[in-house]
Structure formats: structure tokens, C-alpha cells
Amino acid sequence: MLGASVTVPSACSVLSLDVGRKRIGLAGCDPLGITVSPLPALHRGRFDNDLLVLRHHCQTRSVQGLVVGLPLDAAGQPTAQAEHCRRYGVRLAQSLGLPLAWVNEHSSTWAAGERHGLQGDRTGRLDSAAAALLLEQWLQDGPALKPAQSMAAGTGAEPIDGGS
């Protein structure tokens, strides 16, 4: 379920994540929020190993916030994977000391596959293309980044702003 009021975010360098069980699609934008670029997908390992790679991306790109996709169903309700994504996003944001925002990623992988001809891709290119779509969506619709601590108590059932 999407929130009624949307606050369009201030432009800043952001890292977008499409969190999956095997890979995390990654995309970033320039500090003005004009150019969105897919980045090489991260093949999942232990959280500490993921954190090293993601911290490096954040430092080299001067990232000021994270956007994490939440897979909601067609009715806007959280899926089982949404809770995994929420926990991962909060843990990552807290570890990096960055604010974050959630974006409804319903159909983002399908849309990315259609847009870029990547249906069935297993290399991670599709995951990162989906992360780029999430970031484009966030830049247009918000919501504003919030401290991870304010999201830590989330159950995955509360509404999120932005998204389609």
C-alpha cells in the first residue's frame, strides 16, 4: 500500500539495491540526480563480505543514502521476500551510517527485462537494470531518505511512499 503524501527527495548521490537471495542488483546516480547508471551486481555472500564491497561503492561514489526495493504484491502488500529485503536494508544502512528509503519494486525486474532485452539473464545485469529502474522511480517520486534507526522497528506491513 502506497502512502498518500510523497516528498520528492533532494538530489544527492544514492546507491540503489535490488536485493535478492543470490545477487544484489546495484545502481547509482550522480550527485545532482540526473544520470542513473547500473553497476555490476554483487553476488551474495556473508553479510560482512557484502558490506566490504558495498562500503567501497559508497566511499568511491560519495554515496549519501540508500534506496532499497521492497517486493510488494499486486495489491501493495509485502511479500515474504519484502521482509528479508527490509531487514537487509536496515542492517546495511545502520552499518554504513546512511539514511535510506524504500521503493515498491513490484514488476521492476520484468520491466527491466523488457526495456533492456534481458529476460532470463542470470549474470546480474538484469538485477542491476532493475536497481536502476528503482532509482529512477525514487528520483521522480520519493520518498525522502530517513535515518535507518527510524525504520528498524518496521514489520514490513506499514505503507511505503512512492512507487507504482
UniProtKB/Swiss-Prot annotation:
Keywords assigned by UniProt, alphabetized: Cytoplasm, Hydrolase, Nuclease, Ribosome biogenesis
Function: Could be a nuclease involved in processing of the 5'-end of pre-16S rRNA.
Pfam hit, one: RuvX
Species for this entry: Synechococcus sp. (strain CC9902)
Keyword Lipid biosynthesis: no
UniProt xrefs under InterPro entries: RNaseH-like_sf (IPR012337), YqgF (IPR005227), YqgF/RNaseH-like_dom (IPR006641), YqgF/RNaseH-like_dom_sf (IPR037027)
Record-listed E.C. numbers: 3.1.-.-
GO cellular component: cytosol
Enzyme class: hydrolase
Keyword check for Cytoplasm: yes
NCBIfam families cross-referenced by the UniProt entry: RNAse_H_YqgF
The protein's name: Putative pre-16S rRNA nuclease
Coiled coil start-end: none
PANTHER family: POLYNUCLEOTIDYL TRANSFERASE, RIBONUCLEASE H-LIKE SUPERFAMILY PROTEIN
Subcellular location: Cytoplasm
UniProt superkingdom: Bacteria
Spans traversing the lipid bilayer: none
Disulphide-bridged cysteine pairs: none
Similarity remark: Belongs to the YqgF nuclease family.
GO biological process: rRNA 5'-end processing
One term of GO molecular function: nuclease activity
